[in-house]
Regions:
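Alpha/beta enzyme core
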Residues: 1-6, 10, 16-170, 178
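Short glycine/threonine-rich catalytic loop with a Thr-x-Gly-x-Asp
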Residues: 173
Length: 178
């Protein structure tokens, strides 16, 4: 207990710990979960959706998922987008029943996307499919977040806002050192 220290905006845990944090929470901060088979995103869509559903049911305020890189890098953009849309649908259905609004962050894993063009395409794909935030990296790959990737993503957010009026958040994460 450190009353002089500010509270975090959020505490990030694996999906199965959402209920534990919710029960122990004595202050106002968000519970963020990394979900949908984090960090690789390698499983059946049904498994990912069930994990997201359970996390939101148990109190997650924000859900972070990793872009389906296997589909995206193979040029199967619709498969990658549909996965995000399905996650968004599950989040909205479950949170709606609870009278809550739960945010979706899509981690692009920009170090694996490699090119500014891929980073831009993934940014627009995630935003159009329903992401509330786009995030650079899990921190589990190398390279992770880079200033160059951040610039591309922020420029895409600006262009998307100008075209749609919808505000999207940006989260730089993974491999950031000071």
């Amino acid at each position: 207990s450190y009353p002089e220290w500010p509270l975090p905006a959020s505490i990030c845990v694996f999906s199965n710990f959402a209920a534990v944090v919710k029960e122990a929470r004595k202050a106002d901060f968000n519970i963020t979960v990394v979900s949908a088979c984090f960090p690789s995103s390698q499983s059946f869509l049904e498994v990912k959706l069930k994990e997201v559903e359970m996390a939101v049911e148990q109190g997650a305020d924000e859900v972070d998922i990793v872009l389906a890189l296997n589909a995206f890098l193979a040029g199967n953009y619709e498969v990658a987008a549909e996965e995000i849309r399905q996650v968004r649908r599950v989040i909205d259905e479950v949170a709606g029943k609870q009278g809550r609004n739960v945010h979706l962050k899509v981690i692009l894993e920009t170090g694996l996307l490699k090119t500014p063009e891929n980073i831009a395409n993934a940014s627009f794909l995630a935003m159009e499919a329903g992401a509330d935030f786009i995030k650079t990296s899990t921190g589990k790959t190398s390279p992770a977040a880079t200033p160059e990737a951040a610039v591309v993503m922020c420029e895409c957010i600006k262009l998307y806002y100008k075209a749609t009026g919808r505000k999207i958040g940006f989260k730089p994460a993974g491999g950031i050192v000071t």
